[in-house]
C-alpha cells in the first residue's frame, strides 16, 4: 500500500471510530460494498480499547475516575454511566446514557419475546454531514485493493466491542448460508450432492424430498432409495433374507433399473415401505406365535429319533439314532442323500461349504465331503461317545462322555492333528463352544469351565446350576446355558457372574440358541420357548415378561434346534423335523410395488 492509500485508510478508520455506537450498527453499506467482509468476521475478537495512559484518563474524564463502558462480570448491561468517553487514536467518541439504555431495552425485549437474538438500535435521524462523510468513506474504501480492504476491515472489527460483533454476525449470517444441494448440481457436481444425501436414513430422506423441487430431483435422479436398500442388505441379515425370499434382491447391485422406460427411483421408493411392513409382520409373528409349519417325517424301521441338525437356504443335514446322516432338500422336503459309516447313533454334526463333520456314540469323529457325500477322514481318540463338536478357522474342539475335551488343528479335511487334551470335568462333557479368546465347556458335573483358546490353559469355572448342564451357546461376553434343573442361565464370561435365571420349562433343557434379539430353547417336555434376550439382560424386567411364546407341536423330547430371523428348525425324539416359518406364506402377503407409470412383478418364493 502506497503512502497516499495509507493516509486514506487512516482517515477512514478514524471516521468510523468517531461515529456513535448506534450509527456503527446502521452503517451496513460498507459490508455491502465488499463481499470479502462476509468471510472475515470472527466473533472471537476483543472489545474497544480504552484509556491507554493516565493523561488520556484525565483528559477524557475531567479529572474524575474512569467510567467503564463494559459492565462488570455477569452483568446484562443494565446501566451505563451517564457520560463516558473513549479515546481511540486521539479521537473522542461520546456515548450518551440515553442511547445506550434505548438499545439495551430493545435487545431485552427481543430476547424476552423469543423473536430474535439480534439487538436492534433505536432509529435516529442521520445528519447531512454524516451521510456525506459516510459516502466519502465508502468511496475511499472502494479505491483500495482487495487485500487492503481486508486489512482495513480486520483492523476495524478489532476495534469493536462484543455488542457490535453480535450485530455484524446477525447481518452476515444470512449471507453465509447456502443451499449446497441446489448449488452443487448447478455447477455440474450432481454426484457430490447425491453422495451427501446417500448417508441419510429413510426418515431423513423422506424429509429431504419435501424441501423443494430441486432436492426432490436430486433424490430421484440419484437412485438414493436403491442405495439405501442396498446398504441395509449389506449390513443386516434380516434384509438379506427378505431380499432372497421376496425376490427383489435381483434388482439390487445393478446399474440397470428393472424397466428402463419407467422412473427408476419410484420402484425402490415404493419397495422400501413394503420391506418395512414385512419386518414389522415378522416381529409381530414372533411375539404372537403366528407361523406356518412344515413337517419332515424321518421315521424308518430303525429310526428312533433325530439327535442333531443344521440347515441353510438349500438343505437340512440331520443326524439320526439309526447311525445315518440324512440330507434333505429344504424346498421340497425330500431326502437327497444318506451318508452311512458310523456304527452308532449320530449325536452331533456341523458343516461348512466343504465338509460335514459328525460325532457318534461309536466314539469316532468322521469327516465327509459335503457335495459328494464321500467319507474323507476318521478320527479315533475318545474312548466313549462323542457328544458335541465345533470347528472354525482351522481349529476343532470335541467333547466326550469320557470327561475330556480334545482340541484339533485342521490343516485340511484329511490332515487333522490333535493339539491338546483338556481335563478337568468330573462327569461327561456334554457341549463345547469357542471363539478366538475362550473355549467354553459344560458338563454333567453342574459346572461350566472356561479355557484360553491360544494356550488351552484353564481360566475359570462358572457355578450356579443345581444339576447337570446339557447345552450352551457362547458369543462375545455372553454364555447361555440350559440344565436338567429345568432352568436357563445367562452368564458374563469375563467376570463369571450369573446375569439372569429363566424358569418355565418343566423338564431338562436340551438345546438352546440365541441371537441379538431372542433366546430359543427346547426341552424334554416337548416345548420350544422363545425368550426376549434384551429384557432378560435388564435386571429391572419382571420375570413374567421374559417368555414371549411357547410353541407346542412336537410329541416327544426336543433334541436340537437352530433358528434365524424368519424360522426355527427343530428335531425331536418323535422322528420329525419341524420348520416354523414366522414370515408365514410369502405368496399370501406379497403385493407388487407400483411406480407412477409401471407395475413391477413382486416375486415371492
Curated annotation (Swiss-Prot):
GO terms for molecular function: beta-catenin binding; protein dimerization activity; protein phosphorylated amino acid binding; ubiquitin ligase activator activity; ubiquitin protein ligase activity; ubiquitin-like ligase-substrate adaptor activity; ubiquitin-protein transferase activity. GO terms for cellular component: cytoplasm; cytosol; nucleus; SCF ubiquitin ligase complex. WD repeats lie at residues 301-338, 341-378, 381-418, 424-461, 464-503, 505-541, 553-590. Residues 190-228 are annotated as: Required for down-regulation of SNAI1. One of its GO terms (biological process) is protein dephosphorylation. SUPFAM superfamilies: F-box domain, WD40 repeat-like. Ubiquitinated via 'Lys-11'-linked polyubiquitin by some cullin-5-RING E3 ubiquitin-protein ligase complex (ECS complex), leading to its degradation. Deubiquitinated by OTUD5, promoting its stability. Residues 182-228 form the F-box domain. It is found in: Cytoplasm; Nucleus. The N-terminal D domain mediates homodimerization. This is F-box/WD repeat-containing protein 1A. It comes from Mus musculus (Mouse). The gene is Btrc.
